[in-house]
């Protein structure tokens, strides 16, 4: 039909757009293996698929390797590195179905060469978004972040990707932990007091595991734990149990009294306590800014700001003009209300920032909004005081005289 005469119809979508925060953020893991010719980065849809890939990468007597073959290879020294140790542990404990980037550092007997390979493997993760079209939100490095040079590259990569991670302090006491923790200052990194112990099914023995790696995996598990509201990404890791047998370093924890964990908490160090299982205790960053020391708070506002970017992108260069800006504002407002309803936030408001949205800015098509909001606080201390009084003596009289 002609568009000049007759009936013409069309439709358009008007109003706020939905904003979604993913509960299954990609994870990047740096592991070491002698089964690669050079450093190499891989992508998998899950950790299980990653493990199967590396098992099937080589054959034994013309057949696909089994876990028994892996155990034999580790025992005779033909398999070196920590790749299988950690991937097998992960698949034994959890089903991690998230986009998974594995950056493999080539194993070397030369410690300096191995260190260089690990640093390069960490640095290469910055290219994961362009290579695999995924943006790692969590980065884990098994075993090696106690080295200051490796730790610095790790933190630099985390900041480049606006991700988050953990640092293994591997301390023997609180004083050493405090000294090591002072070497770092980042709102995206959580220092960990000591490593963890668990049964290694590949060596049939108790083994030491990097707390950095285990908490990186655990962060994914907690993210996916809320299947109803899907806001597990806003949960703290503190006071949650880990599927491990023990911590390498004992920390005195006395419920209701002062103990060793208080000193560690005051110095923004996460520890592990034994209370009805092995639990994560404290979840802070090592930032110097008090407002950025709550790792949960940092993650919440990170995720909110990222989610809004995708939602308001369609309004850029819109032919609707100022109506598009109004719809963008409605989109952000509805998102904040949704987060309040899901108890991630306790309140919030959005307004046009007129100090920045000047007449000149409007002429250039630039509009600025301020969102004033607060995260739902997590109780870290609940004090209870019992006071002995005699104001209930009347009950005694009534009991005797009844």
Predicted regions and their residues:
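A glycine- and small-residue-enriched flexible loop/hinge signal that marks low-structured segments
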Residues: 2-22, 26-36, 41-45, 55, ...
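Conserved structured core elements
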Residues: 4-5, 148, 326, 330, ...
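N-terminal assembly/attachment segments of tailed bacteriophage virion structural proteins
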Residues: 37-44, 48-95
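Short, intrinsically disordered, mixed-charge
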Residues: 56, 259, 334-338
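Acidic/glycine-enriched edge-of-secondary-structure segments
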Residues: 69-76, 88-120
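Composition- and surface-driven signal marking solvent-exposed, interaction-prone regions
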Residues: 153-154, 328, 350-351, 383-387
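Acidic, low-complexity glycine/serine/threonine-rich segments
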Residues: 291-356
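C-terminal edge-of-domain segments
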Residues: 356-402
